[in-house]
């Protein structure tokens, strides 16, 4: 507030802003920090008295649907409760098929990160030998679209029971330009944590499409690269660890608001991207460029395998050559490469994980008392079509949704259907599914 605002007073207690620590402005009214604290005490007393009043009246307290439900705070993991890398990988195996090397890298990095947090939460137990500072190791996941980058990060957050937020790097721009500020990433995490700052400071943020903020050119340009190098520069401090000011309503539409301060030192950042063309950069570095000729007998699958093998050998210098600035690469020391999904892996994704797509649709139809079956040829045909679409596991849901649309439209209105069978012909020709009706619903010879 300016020096001309010394006359401002709290609308509730009448104290001037000089008499209180904080005066919060609203539309035509003001409230001081002391009144806010008093309101919190009153609400806490009412919440504590409600169960007692209900017991005295012989009944249970009626839920007040108008009051927002506060999520119970997560119990923080002690050192002994942190799952070991083998346990983390085993849990990931239940939800994500393949990508064993990436799972190992993630499991070790996440285990070490939360060991670091448990050490920081026990300052009283330090000895003279414990003054070694453990630095944060953010993670970079490289792999084609639909290979499981986001799912891996999301599953990690589930096993650790920490807040998790996903951000899209393509929407970010430097401050002052059209687009989102980098602080909006922290705002998403804060919202997931129900505005609990301490909880948010232990969370995981996954920044997708990170390769899209690569520099447009290796040479400095006269024009400002506000969505490329500029965003990388803006993310540097956040990745390393800083006290960031986060506007709770978004900074650009509500510029005059009190910001929430978040320490990003203990937030784990996982960045993911396809990095299309990085394999060629690695190939040039290794001196194995094939002068533009294609070897006879090369198939799309063998080309993808070669590209995936090259991505496994990526080094920080390759990322700099690709367009990431050295300072940014240095703040993401852990790198893992995901392999493209082949036909057999897509088949496994359809049927094996705990929440496999086939199991999800079987559960949906079971609620309508219908047994859903996919024969083996149908599953393979779905995987083959998904492989041709080149969008990884994401294509599977789209294909199954197309197949099941008519079935899910008709079945809720029919009580005579007992079983639904999806065949290869239905997948390839989009023909009608085979429906088996209850024997009791069949016409009898007398009625026929």
From Swiss-Prot:
ClpX-type ZB domain segment(s): 1-51
GO molecular function: ATP binding; ATP hydrolysis activity; ATP-dependent protein folding chaperone; protein dimerization activity; unfolded protein binding; zinc ion binding
GO cellular component: HslUV protease complex
Gene Ontology terms describing biological process: cell division; proteolysis involved in protein catabolic process
Keywords: ATP-binding, Chaperone, Metal-binding, Nucleotide-binding, Zinc
Chain residues that bind Zn(2+): 10, 13, 32, 35
Pfam families hit by this protein: AAA_2 (PF07724), ClpB_D2-small (PF10431), zf-C4_ClpX (PF06689)
Residue ranges of the region described as Disordered: 53-79
Annotated binding of ATP, by residue: 144-151
Subunit structure: Component of the ClpX-ClpP complex. Forms a hexameric ring that, in the presence of ATP, binds to fourteen ClpP subunits assembled into a disk-like structure with a central cavity, resembling the structure of eukaryotic proteasomes.
Family in the record: Belongs to the ClpX chaperone family.
UniProt xrefs under HAMAP family: ClpX (MF_00175)
Name of the protein in its database record: ATP-dependent Clp protease ATP-binding subunit ClpX
Species assigned in the record: Rippkaea orientalis (strain PCC 8801 / RF-1) (Cyanothece sp. (strain PCC 8801))
Gene: clpX
